[in-house]
Amino acid sequence: PHEVSLLMSEIVAYHLKDKEHIAIYDPTSGSGSLLINIGHSASKYMSRDSIRYYAQELKENTYNLTRMNLVMRGINPSNIFTRNADTLEDDWPIDLESYPPVLRVDAVVSNPPYSQQWSPEGKELDPRYSEYGLAPKSKADYAFLLHDLYHIKPDGIMTIVLPHGVLFRCGEEERIRTNLIEKN
């Protein structure tokens, strides 16, 4: 809902208010509304030109809306980085200047599709998941959460909208929750 998006935006912007430059990433960007709202909230504390936007979206028609919506809101196109791909299958964003080539950002925000099926096969060594465990094939909620965590800087912030089931489901999800708590 729009109200949740606005709340997330204000929380993220306040957390980042003392930074001169920030990078924000939405791995399930849809039309880009979360990024737009965060950019608007963050611009209370910093120049709009000091914000870099990273967006990834699986659906091609929605992916096209992301960049268009960001540009239509007056965001400098050179600060927009978008990709049409499957977030869980192909890790992005990357930084080829670093090793490993993962891009860490100041904020990751997302509203992924709830309890979507995914393919965990062959991902045991994927650094996004290997430390905490693999989400069950029938529910990718924790796969999205772990992807998001993997991309934040140590002093960064993450906000994500997930179904309440992630708080109490058993099996693999319980093990991931336990690992997240134990590893702080």
Where are these regions (language model features)?
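Short glycine-dipeptide loop
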Residues: 152-158
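Glycine-rich S-adenosyl-L-methionine
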Residues: 128-152
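Conserved catalytic-core motifs of eukaryotic protein kinase domains, centered on the activation segment
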Residues: 120
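Conserved S-adenosyl-L-methionine
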Residues: 2-107, 115-117, 126-128, 143, ...
